[in-house]
């Protein structure tokens, strides 16, 4: 276990008081679950979370100061019960060391040292953290993500009775009645044999309403084509009245608004960090893609339903937001030449498939997304923002969160050059240029 943890966190962590702790000692303490808490001292929501998380952490660890809770009392010094085998590590985005020190001083858990800025950034990219505060739980032995939305764990299971909060099958989480907007109720068993889109959305969210209008047409086309397909609306509306108003526009099913526990479990299952989000599932309930929103917007005629992920994407307005999710390889081409974009996709697809398969075998997300960018206003804006030359073809890796770019300046781009470029990036052998 210590090997994985040291690779992830480095050799040393620090306590709130500034004392160093050897990472390999976590294994000796029987830690089975690791929480990574991403936050910042300047964020009011992070300050609020720290207070509630401290009480939660204390209860699970059996600390008397946390008040009565499972495991507290005389047996607290004994071999830890499974629910107590938890450690949390704070991963900060602070830019001021004094503010960081003031913030971590009262934390009862550990923190990544302030100086480990590069490692912090790698963790943010690895787990696709898009907002703060965020709390994810990992199996401390295998490194697999157990739960992507630990904030809901704290809210829904404050005593830690469901520890270690591992993912449950979709069929189990969705079990119960589902509604149509005419008041008809169906059992979730009616979904058997169907592809399912789990749609997290809300009426108060303008991008949600825009997507819903497109999704209604996509749903109609797919059903008319004879496909077994259903969508389940999981509302984030702020009132039942708003839910009913929004749901009246939808021809599909919904989790009842009053079933807050089931809505929360679905958010937890898929680690929802923002809306709108459309998760596409196969008939067995396994995730096909988390990027259903992008796929629907890019495939107006639904010819590629159920939208299995492509190893290489063509950069567009609808998927450009993915550039902010982590490092992305972008091959810029002259799209005025017919077939140039397709040839570029074929050029980088073998290495993209190899990288994706390697990390899928480890049940991890690939550390890179792969794009081909043609010539349009959006691509021009991207070149301007990243200060890239107008050359084409141009092979780059862009890391927006690190404000860094890597450019391969060669006359001819070959599969071997692409693979070497990617491997050198993953091995941290490339020198970044600032964006």
From Swiss-Prot:
Residues found modified as N-acetylserine: 2
Q: Which reaction does it catalyse?
A: [protein]-dithiol + NAD(+) = [protein]-disulfide + NADH + H(+); [protein]-dithiol + NADP(+) = [protein]-disulfide + NADPH + H(+)
* GO MF: thioredoxin-disulfide reductase (NADPH) activity
Occurrences of domain Thioredoxin (ranges): 167-321
Q: Name one GO biological process term.
A: circulatory system development
**Keywords in alphabetical order:** Acetylation, Cytoplasm, Developmental protein, Differentiation, Disease variant, Dwarfism, NAD, Nucleus, Oxidoreductase, Wnt signaling pathway
Q: Where in the cell is it found?
A: Cytoplasm, Cytosol; Nucleus
- Cellular component, GO annotation: cytosol; nucleus
Q: What is its EC number?
A: 1.8.1.8
Q: Which family does the entry's similarity section mention?
A: Belongs to the nucleoredoxin family.
Disease annotated for this entry: Robinow syndrome, autosomal recessive 2: A recessive form of Robinow syndrome, a disease characterized by short-limb dwarfism, costovertebral segmentation defects and abnormalities of the head, face and external genitalia. The clinical signs are generally far more severe in recessive cases, particularly skeletal abnormalities. All patients with the recessive form suffer from vertebral segmentation abnormalities, resulting in scoliosis and chest deformities. Rib fusions are considered to be characteristic of the autosomal recessive form.
PANTHER family linked: NUCLEOREDOXIN
Please state what the protein is called: Nucleoredoxin
What does the record give as the organism's lineage? Eukaryota, Metazoa, Chordata, Craniata, Vertebrata
């Amino acid at each position: 276990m210590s090997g994985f943890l040291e690779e992830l966190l480095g050799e040393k962590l620090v306590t709130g008081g500034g004392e160093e702790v050897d990472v390999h000692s976590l294994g000796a303490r029987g830690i089975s679950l690791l929480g990574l808490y991403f936050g910042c001292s300047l964020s009011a929501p992070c300050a609020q979370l720290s207070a509630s998380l401290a009480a939660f952490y204390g209860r699970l660890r059996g600390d008397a100061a946390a008040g009565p809770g499972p495991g507290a009392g005389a047996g607290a010094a004994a071999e830890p019960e499974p629910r107590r085998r938890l450690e949390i590590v704070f991963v900060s985005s602070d830019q001021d060391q004094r503010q960081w020190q003031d913030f971590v001083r009262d934390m009862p858990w550990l923190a990544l040292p302030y100086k480990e800025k590069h490692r912090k950034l790698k963790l943010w990219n690895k787990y696709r953290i898009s907002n703060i505060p965020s709390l994810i739980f990992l199996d401390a032995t295998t490194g697999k993500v157990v739960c992507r939305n630990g904030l809901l764990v704290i809210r829904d299971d404050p005593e830690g009775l469901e520890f270690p909060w591992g993912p449950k099958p979709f069929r189990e989480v969705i079990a119960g009645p589902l509604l149509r907007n005419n008041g008809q109720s169906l059992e979730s068993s009616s979904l058997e044999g169907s592809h399912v889109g789990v749609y997290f959305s809300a009426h108060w969210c303008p991008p949600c309403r825009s997507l819903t209008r497109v999704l209604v047409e996509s749903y109609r086309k797919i059903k008319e084509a004879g496909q077994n397909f259903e969508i389940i609306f999981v509302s984030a509306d702020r009132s039942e009245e708003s839910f009913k108003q929004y749901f009246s526009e939808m021809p599909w099913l919904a989790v009842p608004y009053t079933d807050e526990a089931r809505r929360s479990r679905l958010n937890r299952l898929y680690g929802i960090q923002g809306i709108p989000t459309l998760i596409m599932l196969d008939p067995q309930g396994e995730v096909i893609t988390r990027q259903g929103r992008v796929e629907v917007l890019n495939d107006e005629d639904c010819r590629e339903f159920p939208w299995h992920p492509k190893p290489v994407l063509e950069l567009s307005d609808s998927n450009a937001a993915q550039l902010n999710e982590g490092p992305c390889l972008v091959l810029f081409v002259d799209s005025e030449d017919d077939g140039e974009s397709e040839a570029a996709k074929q050029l980088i697809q073998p290495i993209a498939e190899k990288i994706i398969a390697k990390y899928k075998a480890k049940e991890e997300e690939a550390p890179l997304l792969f794009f081909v960018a043609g010539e349009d206003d959006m691509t021009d804006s991207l070149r301007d923002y990243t200060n890239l030359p107008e050359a084409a073809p141009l092979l780059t890796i862009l890391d927006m969160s690190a404000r860094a770019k890597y450019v391969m300046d060669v006359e001819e781009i070959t599969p071997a050059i692409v693979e070497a470029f990617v491997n050198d990036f993953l091995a941290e052998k490339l020198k970044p240029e600032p964006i």
